[in-house]
Regions:
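Acidic, glycine/proline-rich Ca2+-coordinating loop motifs
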Residues: 1-388
Length: 388
């Protein structure tokens, strides 16, 4: 049985919407000469994502419904990009690119299945400077895992020795060299405590979510600080969050480094899925100074994904952020969007409304550490995005 929402089955309405979108796109000045074709059947990839009961048959509004991530890197040095998929249930999967758009499952040989825990996402990074990508995997209260790559696509679990075995409600793993010592450090984003201590699962274990999980940001006791780990060399890391002043309590799913003020030191923009984003300025690799509202007076409320790139080709890095809360005032998609765009949020939930942008935000770098929010002028809004 396939259920198609009436508004999506209305071909006349879809044609009108398509015409409007093409008209808008023609004015954007952005053009391309490529197209995408679904090649999944030919690829040989049979991976299927499985989610815990709280996000499936026993669905409740909890952060489990945010799903999982993936990471891409050339794990065996053959010049082709391989793909690592993360699943909440049943284990993760590493698919080796054999060329010609074909892949083979090498999870067992690589030793990276992690079938005993609820996965969230993963990041590849050459943390020991040996020329091959190592792997860090985040989980929900089963302990994060760090693997060292032997250069041939075989991985060794070095979590305990590395100091990166954080156990909590982790999400994004952002590797960057914050102190410019030539070694990649790690900023680990933690969402906040959204699960109880009750364990459930049929053939697997997970922690049941709070019934009021999405009100967790109103309860200080559920905050979970994100962590900054300094790379000491030889894949050994030390938590320097307190030492550097980077003690962020946002309900964060991701973050991104950016040299926002042009001083040569990577600063950090931290997303908050249940509040306003935060910005920390790097003070010479020794400390981070919170300058969120001075540099970004208004940010998205409910940010889910971030990319730093040069939007307008002026040589300066800009910031594109997708937000799960739309600012659209007219119906543009499924009925849920119309309901969502007319929601009224209590002051208690949204905090300082004057500092909030409802919908995606694009910060154009004006130089000199100044940014201007231009999402409306470049048509950057879309229907309920969850990642970027």
């Amino acid at each position: 049985v396939r259920l198609i929402p009436p508004q999506l089955a209305d071909t006349a309405r879809l044609k009108t919407l398509g015409d409007e979108q093409r008209k808008s796109a023609s004015r954007s000045g952005a053009f391309h000469d490529f197209r995408f074709t679904d090649r999944l059947p030919e690829s040989g990839i049979t991976y299927r994502n499985r989610v815990v009961s709280d996000a499936a048959k026993n669905y409740k509004s909890a952060h489990y419904d945010h799903g999982t991530g993936m990471a891409v890197a050339d794990v065996d040095g053959d010049g082709r990009l391989d793909v690592y998929f993360v699943s909440q249930v049943g284990g993760n999967a590493l698919w080796r690119n054999v060329g010609g758009g074909r892949f083979e499952d090498i999870t067992r040989e690589a030793g990276v299945a992690l079938s005993d825990r609820v996965g969230v996402t993963a990041s590849f990074a050459d943390t020991d400077n040996d020329g091959d990508p190592d792997l860090y995997v985040t989980t929900v209260r089963h302990g994060n895992v760090f693997y060292e790559n032997d250069g041939r696509g075989r991985f060794r679990d070095i979590t305990d020795a590395s100091g990166l075995g954080y156990n909590g409600h982790s999400s994004g793993a952002v590797f960057f060299d914050f102190n410019r010592d030539g070694r990649l450090d790690l900023f680990l984003t933690n969402v906040g405590r959204y699960t109880t201590d009750t364990i459930a699962g049929e053939g697997y274990r997970f922690y049941v979510a709070f019934e009021d999980a999405f009100q967790g940001h109103l309860k200080p006791e559920r905050s979970e600080q994100s962590r900054l780990y300094r790379n000491e060399g030889a894949n050994r890391f030390v938590d320097v969050s307190a030492e550097t002043g980077l003690q962020d309590l946002s309900w964060s799913g991701d973050a991104s480094p950016i040299d926002a003020n042009g001083d040569g030191w990577p600063d950090l923009y931290v997303l908050n899925m249940q509040g306003n984003d935060e910005y920390y300025e790097n003070a010479g690799g020794a400390r981070f100074v919170r300058r969120s509202r001075e540099v970004f007076p208004r940010t998205s409320w409910g940010a889910m994904g971030i990319k730093v790139f040069d939007v307008d080709n002026d040589g300066r890095m800009d910031i594109f952020i997708v937000d799960m809360h739309s600012d659209m005032s007219h119906e543009v998609g499924p009925d849920r969007e119309r309901e969502k765009s007319h929601m009224t949020w209590s002051e208690e939930v949204r905090g300082d409304g004057k500092a909030s942008i409802w919908g995606n935000s694009v910060f154009r770098n004006e130089g000199g550490g100044r940014f201007r929010e231009v999402s409306d002028s470049i048509n950057a809004e879309m229907y309920w995005p969850w990642g970027l």
